[in-house]
């Protein structure tokens, strides 16, 4: 398996450089891999966005704006991405893995902090940070 290591500072610089002039604030926060490590995603906390980077990490290819900042992401076997967002409008989103279009959304309270797909139980697990809950 080939490892690709891209320092976060380089991604932040490239993300800022590739951003359109009408964007006001870019705040790279979290990194996620999908498609067995072939797809790189970075979050823009200030813009409530999930951004798919090019495979070499040099430019932003796609983005989706969500209700609040992305805390975590996982992928199911069909390629759909599952994302939890925190804040007053905390949500769990199901996204089409290719188009980044929203397939479904579920209110999840204000504090979803992580999400994981379990291939054994074929289910999603979500933690609620301050509520001491595991869904």
Regions flagged by a language model, labelled:
Residues 1-4:
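Positively charged n-region of N-terminal signal peptides that target proteins for export
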Residues 6-9:
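Short helix-onset patch at the extreme N-terminus, typifying the N->h transition
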Residues 12-135:
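Predominantly soluble domains enriched in secretory-pathway, periplasmic, or organellar proteins
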């Amino acid at each position: 398996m080939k490892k690709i290591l891209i320092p976060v500072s380089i991604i932040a610089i490239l993300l800022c450089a590739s951003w359109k002039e009408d964007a006001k604030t870019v705040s790279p926060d979290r990194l996620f891999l999908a498609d067995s490590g072939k797809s790189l995603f970075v979050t823009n906390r200030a813009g409530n966005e999930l951004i798919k980077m090019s495979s070499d990490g040099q430019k932003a290819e796609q983005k989706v704006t969500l209700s609040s900042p992305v805390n975590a992401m996982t992928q199911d076997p069909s390629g759909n991405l599952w994302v939890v967002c925190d804040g007053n409008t905390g949500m769990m989103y199901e996204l089409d893995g290719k188009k980044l279009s929203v397939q479904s959304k579920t209110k999840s309270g204000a504090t979803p902090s992580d999400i994981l797909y379990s291939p054994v139980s074929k289910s999603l697990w979500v933690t609620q940070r301050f509520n001491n809950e595991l869904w």
